């Protein structure tokens, strides 16, 4: 019988129960025992849901209090020295939270660990920090306790752990030069014995299968990392009394395929949604291994074409029999939990969609079809009818948008003058001091703001009342920025629920859910828009808010837009046309907004592209095509302004060395970036490339509630000035302030402005 399994399930809860419990605990409103009870209840509920859907092997270890990589670091005892962890004591929950956030209800505050994107997704993981002589030990029992929980509830647990090579590859350390540094492989001698001990612990618990995630096998790996695989897995297999399922996802294995097939594991999972590995080469080399195929898209929300999936796997099933397993392509972490909750989506659109729970039901339909179960026929027919209806729907295509997209090839992608001439005109218009200060855009979203927005959407406030409340918040934000003496102001984005959702609600072709939340990091959840059809802007989206803010001050106020690539990347995107076409439709809509902002007297316009790098294909051979259309879309949206209008962009959690030419090709007048957690290391790319335009390196980490020190920020900017001309430098936080409290924001920005003043005096 074909085994159905799941690589992971969303941990946040259908109504974000984990987020609410986390934040209550951090605020001191919930005891740790109460927080742990919430986590246990969510695990129990999610396991039951998966079992009801027909999952045979239950993933355990996909739950995490903040991030699964951080969770595994704590299990291994990988705790940086600044957190003062006793080398012989267990790593407790508050230490884990301090590593993630810089502080917790107990323990001394310290600088949080670096956070970065999980491959090409919008999820973030906490980067493990390794010393050159790093030791490892089992320092936390929670994973083993969860295995016992699952067994007690009658499930067959399949623990899920990061593979040792993926864990090292994703780590950093002062002695190591980037992800690919083979010097990290020297730590395997210390690491592998602990992995062997972990596997033995699982065996002692009666575990039959362990899922070891090695997603770096979909990357372009150096030879040294490829060669390490056989050595590592020989050692793991020789000690393991459980069966090992090597899981890969987010793409095909390419030249790593034969390496994976040679490993002494009992099963191999391949992503058949994003991967294109030749199964004709896999089967002859598979031996007696299990082949798990990820045939349900774990990263999007559209119904699966089950007929096509069956066509692809039926012959394989005939050949492999029970050694063919079925699963989603990757963890369902990247999907909302349950479509059944959605009571505001219209029935037509809803019939096209599938969330995590529904994806497991699709998996069960495939499994039933392979098993010859006639009971699945009606489900297959329902699926078939929904796909056909979507393809024929008049809501998908807009002839006017298609014509404008065709005409866009004739539009210029260049500013009127080069940067050196533009910046002189901009300085004359804006009259900014050296080391000008600004923020990235958003200010704290208070309870009053959220209540007003909720009441407005519920009809308890009319449009005029809501506008008045938002204008009061904007005025408050402008007053504070003037008091603290910032140079380029923002309106604070009080009216925006989310930097992508806000724009999607005002553009044609988008739809929104009520409960379609996915985890971005920690307690931060986002509700991605659904791009189901052609995109266009029916009317101005931000102009009146920006015009009002500018009327309150003589200082320049930035217009704030989210860029086309980021809107694309942070949405669930239609799968019936190339992503580049959808992105250009968004770019044309933003081009109209940029022009209207300029006409309204807004002389600084920021188009955020924090997701530009995460859109890179994982294989470098595919980068050029992506970067060509991504840069084209940004320029399509921005180049129509006059020379004295200053275009800003913002990027966060990015590494720039390998895409610096594309960043320069955007030709933004000012780029602000996240650098505080990396101690300005990211600026090396801009120095080595001789980046020509202005740069604002983030001087403090907004993800931590700790107050930034003036001297530390001055020191960071002095490091920046060693790498870049000081006349090109701006001073700003590393990201928006939406998630911070007002008292934290006031203290941090006052210190930041004082740092800028000290820099001016010293220059």
Curated annotation (Swiss-Prot):
Q: In which pathway does it act?
A: Amino-acid biosynthesis; L-methionine biosynthesis via de novo pathway; L-methionine from L-homocysteine (MetE route): step 1/1
Annotated 5-methyltetrahydropteroyltri-L-glutamate binding lies at 16-19, 117, 524-525, 570, 614
Sorted alphabetically, which keywords does the UniProt record give?
Answer: Amino-acid biosynthesis, Metal-binding, Methionine biosynthesis, Methyltransferase, Repeat, Transferase, Zinc
Gene Ontology molecular function, alphabetical: 5-methyltetrahydropteroyltriglutamate-homocysteine S-methyltransferase activity; zinc ion binding
What's the record's note on cofactor binding? Binds 1 zinc ion per subunit.
- Give the superkingdom in one word: Bacteria
UniProt EC number: 2.1.1.14
Read off the InterPro entries from this record.
Answer: Cbl-indep_Met_Synth_N, Cobalamin-indep_Met_synthase, Met_Synth_C/arc, UROD/MetE-like_sf
Q: Where is the active site?
A: 703 (proton donor)
User: Where along this sequence does the record place binding of L-methionine?
Assistant: 440-442, 493, 608
What is its cofactor? Zn(2+)
Family per UniProt?
A: Belongs to the vitamin-B12 independent methionine synthase family.
Q: What does this protein do?
A: Catalyzes the transfer of a methyl group from 5-methyltetrahydrofolate to homocysteine resulting in methionine formation.
Protein name as catalogued = 5-methyltetrahydropteroyltriglutamate--homocysteine methyltransferase
Source organism (scientific name): Alcanivorax borkumensis (strain ATCC 700651 / DSM 11573 / NCIMB 13689 / SK2)
């Amino acid at each position: 019988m074909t085994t159905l399994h799941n690589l992971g399930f969303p941990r946040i809860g259908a109504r974000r129960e984990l987020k609410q419990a986390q934040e209550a605990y951090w605020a001191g409103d919930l005891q740790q025992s109460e927080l742990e009870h919430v986590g246990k209840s969510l695990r129990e509920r999610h396991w039951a849901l998966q079992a009801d859907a027909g999952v045979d092997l239950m993933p355990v270890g996909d739950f995490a209090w903040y991030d699964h990589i951080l969770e595994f670091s704590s299990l291994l005892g990988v705790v940086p020295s600044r957190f003062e962890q006793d080398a012989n004591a267990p790593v407790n929950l508050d230490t884990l939270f301090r590593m993630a956030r810089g502080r917790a209800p107990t323990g001394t505050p310290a600088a949080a660990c670096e956070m970065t994107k999980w491959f090409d997704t919008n999820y973030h993981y906490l980067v493990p920090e390794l010393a050159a002589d790093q030791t490892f030990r089992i320092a936390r029992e929670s994973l083993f306790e969860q295995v016992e929980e699952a067994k007690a509830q009658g499930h067959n647990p399949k623990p899920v752990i990061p593979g040792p090579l993926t864990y090292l590859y994703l780590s950093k350390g002062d002695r190591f030069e980037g992800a690919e540094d083979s010097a990290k492989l020297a730590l395997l001698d210390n690491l592998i014995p602990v992995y062997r001990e972990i596997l033995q612990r699982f065996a002692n618990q009666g575990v039959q299968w362990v899922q070891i995630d090695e997603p770096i096998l979909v990357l372009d790996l150096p030879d040294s990392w490829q060669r390490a695989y056989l050595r590592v897995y020989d050692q793991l297999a020789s000690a393991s009394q459980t069966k090992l399922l090597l899981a890969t996802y987010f793409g095909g294995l390419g030249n790593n395929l034969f390496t994976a097939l040679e490993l002494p594991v009992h099963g191999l999972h391949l992503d058949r949604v994003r991967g294109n590995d030749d199964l004709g080469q896999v089967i002859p080399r598979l031996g007696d291994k299990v082949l798990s195929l990820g045939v349900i898209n774990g990263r999007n929300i559209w119904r699966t074409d089950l007929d096509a999936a069956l066509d692809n796997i039926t012959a394989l099933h005939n050949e492999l029999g029970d050694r063919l397993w079925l699963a989603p392509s990757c963890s369902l972490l990247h999907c909302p939990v349950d479509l059944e909750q959605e009571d505001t989506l219209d029935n037509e659109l809803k019939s096209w969609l599938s969330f995590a729970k529904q994806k497991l039901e699709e998996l069960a339909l495939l499994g039933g079809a392979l098993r010859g179960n006639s009971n699945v026929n009606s489900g297959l027919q329902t699926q078939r009818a929904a796909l056909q209806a979507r393809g024929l729907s008049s809501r998908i295509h807009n002839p006017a948008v298609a014509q404008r997209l065709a005409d866009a090839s004739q539009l210029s992608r260049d500013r009127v003058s080069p940067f050196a001439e533009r910046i002189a005109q901009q300085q004359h218009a804006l009259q900014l001091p050296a080391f000008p200060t600004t923020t990235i855009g958003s200010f704290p979203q208070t309870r009053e703001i959220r209540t007003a927005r909720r009441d407005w959407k519920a009809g308890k406030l009319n449009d005029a009342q809501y506008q008045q409340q938002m204008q009061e918040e904007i005025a408050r934000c402008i007053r504070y920025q003037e008091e603290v003496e910032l140079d380029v102001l923002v309106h604070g984005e009080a009216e925006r629920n989310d930097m992508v959702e806000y724009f999607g609600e005002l553009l044609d072709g988008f739809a929104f859910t009520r409960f379609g939340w996915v985890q971005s990091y920690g307690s931060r959840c986002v509700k991605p828009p659904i791009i189901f059809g052609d995109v266009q802007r029916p009317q101005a989206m931000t102009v009146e808010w920006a015009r009002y803010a500018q009327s309150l001050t003589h200082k320049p106020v930035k217009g704030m837009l989210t860029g086309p690539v980021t809107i694309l990347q942070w949405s669930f995107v239609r799968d019936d046309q190339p992503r580049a076409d959808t992105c250009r439709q968004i770019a044309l809509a933003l081009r109209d907004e940029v022009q209207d902002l300029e006409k309204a007297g807004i002389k600084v316009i920021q188009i955020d592209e924090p997701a530009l790098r995460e859109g890179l294909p994982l294989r470098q051979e595919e980068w050029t095509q992506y970067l060509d259309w991504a840069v084209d879309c940004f320029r399509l949206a921005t180049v129509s302004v006059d020379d004295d209008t200053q275009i800003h962009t913002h990027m966060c959690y990015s590494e720039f060395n390998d895409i610096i030419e594309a960043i320069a090709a955007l030709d933004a007048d000012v780029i602000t970036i996240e650098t505080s957690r990396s101690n300005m290391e990211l600026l090396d790319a801009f120095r080595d490339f001789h980046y020509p335009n202005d740069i604002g390196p983030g001087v403090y980490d907004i993800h931590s509630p700790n107050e930034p020190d003036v001297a530390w920020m001055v020191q960071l900017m002095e490091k920046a000035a060693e790498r870049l001309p000081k006349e090109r430098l701006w001073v700003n936080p590393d990201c928006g302030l939406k998630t911070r409290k007002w008292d934290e924001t006031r203290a941090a920005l006052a210190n930041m402005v004082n740092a800028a003043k000290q820099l001016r005096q010293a220059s």
